[in-house]
Amino acid sequence: MSFSFNFDVQLTTKCQQDEENQPQDGNEYSEVEPVPGITITTQDETVKAAVEHFPPATPHSLLNDAVSETITIGTLPPLNFLNESVFELTAYERDDEEMILSQTTAQCSDLISGVYEGGLKVWECTYDLLELLERDGERFAEKIVLDLGCGAGLLGILALKRGASQVHFQDYNSTVIEHVTLPNTLLNCLEEEEEEEEEEESKGKKPGKRQNNDEVIIEEEEEESMKSTEKTKSELKNKQKNEEVEDGRPHAKRQALDSSQHPKLSGCRFFSGDWTSFLSLILKEDPSLKYDIIFTSETIYNKAYYSALHNTLHRLLAPGGVIYLATKTHYFGVGGGLHLFEQFVEEKGVFDMEKLWVVEHGLQRHVVAMHFKTKDRF
């Protein structure tokens, strides 16, 4: 099995630490409505409120001065993502309301519990899960996928490239979603659009022209039309800017305008927030939303998060769906790990767990599949 990286730039940073942490879910702190049937124990009376994030009116702005790298695993499509070293070195230039970029740099830390849950880094187990998906050939066509604790979003991006009808990304930190997940998703969407354009041109279509009702429309006319359309979109967006609902989600028309910037993005949604508040937000969807596939990588490092994670998986997995959990055997210094989570899941009696792969080199790691027990499937 081939496993290769294509780095546009390589740097060595002063904060290269070990591997026993990772994401959970976020944005601003506020109280969250209780979800019927769910009991959550937290260390604080408040949790990080769930917020849905949308691509900006000019998505390309997310990629200004971006330095990317590409990972290729076997027959999987290449996955593009921001170079972590460059991102760290340029962190001071970025807007960061959560202040996690400055804190992680100052503390030379990959994890600050309850503040920053590790989403700026791609962790080892994500690569393990990608390798397993390449080996086993999971099919994503027409499926609804959730990348829970997504970080860079590589798992969700793979599903998007493999034909998933919808892919939703969730991370604890809004900074991660806005500065990492969204740009990474756009990097891959742009690549696919360029490939499609090249394919069309190779079939004989001339650049700068298109056919419409047997008339040839010159590039200059197209540009004028695009400018007019963008102006209209901008005016509509400004008009709708204040049409926010109480749960933090924008007006439906605004969603459509934002997602229309790129066809591939129309099937993507992006969320930050604690798992409890994220679950509360998703359960308000009408019609109700369930996921055929849920990815969650390196999210069981802290025992305090198990209840919120389990409840989220329980309420959002579709009947007959599958959860892919990638994890280390034990997270030294944090306390969590696979054995403790298996015990927790067994006590709840909701899911069966199946070990799909054990990785022995380095710290022992696992990829596990979770399904509803037969009585809970429907």
Role assignments for model-derived ranges:
Residues 1-378:
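S-adenosylmethionine-dependent methyltransferases
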